Regions:
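ER/Golgi luminal nucleotide-sugar-dependent glycosyltransferases, focusing on the catalytic module
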Residues: 1-301
Length: 301
């Protein structure tokens, strides 16, 4: 297949750039000859010299300063979704707050719901809205939705290894659902992947019925349920888990603080994730083949 024009999307935040940006640019943007989009929240103190922001060809910015607890975003997203009713179906979505899993000691279920689940689904909705508004989907063949706090142990697989008819997810960190930290999509499966919030609004009774029977839902389980409802879960395929999330010594986080590494000088947010990435790096180093040959063997359908 000829070169597939690729857009990499950094979702929600551009944190940890001082540790990750050079690694990201080399192993993702340069490796894939890709363009960058940032779809993020900004406050008054946001640093517009952030290298993720300055490199981005497309910038979709949500004003968090005016909506620090994201309460306004619920009605904003609902009003900008074509729902054939005057009823506030988003209230069913907010009832999820008592069904989501949290590792924090915060007794405020709504706050835990925000940081574990809602913010991610909202920014997927915000991304989808802007991609349609500015007709970005028609300009690219492939779309990689990811995050800025990743360090890559290996270059990202070239798109020729990832058949566009499938949804490609790293092979790990599923937590009884499906990993939500990176997704490689194409035009035909972009919408059924990202329209989680829209589906909760349009199919509120069905989605709430799916989740009301148990507690401790997490984002990974919600994503899997959503893909099943959209009849695209059978399209999910896996590629090697080659990156891991970090946090700088004084960096902020909405969720997992991580374990500090004295050797590396930063927090490893999910130690098992780092171990998986290192495992794949070691497999490549022992293989004595090119990175393309390594992925051709490692990625099977």
């Amino acid at each position: 297949m000829n070169h597939q024009k690729t857009l990499v999307i950094i979702l929600s935040e551009t944190r940890c750039h001082e540790l990750t940006f050079d690694n990201f640019k080399k192993n993702v943007i340069d490796e894939l000859s890709a363009d960058l989009c940032v779809c993020i929240g900004v406050k008054n103190d946001y640093d517009y010299n952030n290298p993720y922001y300055t490199l981005a060809k497309h910038r979709f910015l949500y004003n968090e300063e005016d909506d620090k607890n994201f309460a306004k975003s619920v009605e904003y997203s609902y009003k900008n979704t074509e729902v054939a009713s005057d009823q506030k179906h988003y209230l069913y979505f907010l009832m999820l707050k008592d069904r989501v899993f949290t590792e924090t000691s915060n007794p405020d279920s709504f706050t835990n719901f925000l940081i574990s689940t809602y913010i991610h689904t909202f920014f997927l909705w915000f991304l989808h809205r802007n991609m349609k508004k500015f007709r970005i989907l028609e300009k690219y063949d492939r779309f990689i939705i990811s995050r800025s706090d990743y360090l890559y142990k290996l270059p990202f697989p070239k798109m020729k290894h990832l058949d566009p008819k499938y949804i490609w997810i790293p092979n790990g960190e599923d937590y009884f659902g499906i990993c939500d930290r990176t997704a490689v999509l194409s035009r035909q499966n972009f919408e059924p992947y990202v329209n989680i919030l829209e589906s909760f609004y349009k199919k509120s009774n069905k989605y709430y019925k799916n989740i009301e029977s148990k507690k401790n839902w997490n984002m990974e389980q919600i994503l899997k349920m959503h893909l099943e409802e959209n009849n695209v879960f059978p399209l999910v395929q896996r590629y090697p888990y080659i990156s891991y999330c970090i946090r700088s010594k004084n960096g902020t986080t909405r969720w997992e603080a991580g374990k500090f590494s004295e050797k590396l000088g930063y927090f490893i947010k999910y130690p098992k994730e780092e171990q998986q990435a290192t495992h794949h790096e070691n497999d490549f180093l022992k293989s004595c083949v090119s990175i393309d040959e390594f992925y051709a063997e490692a990625i099977k359908i």
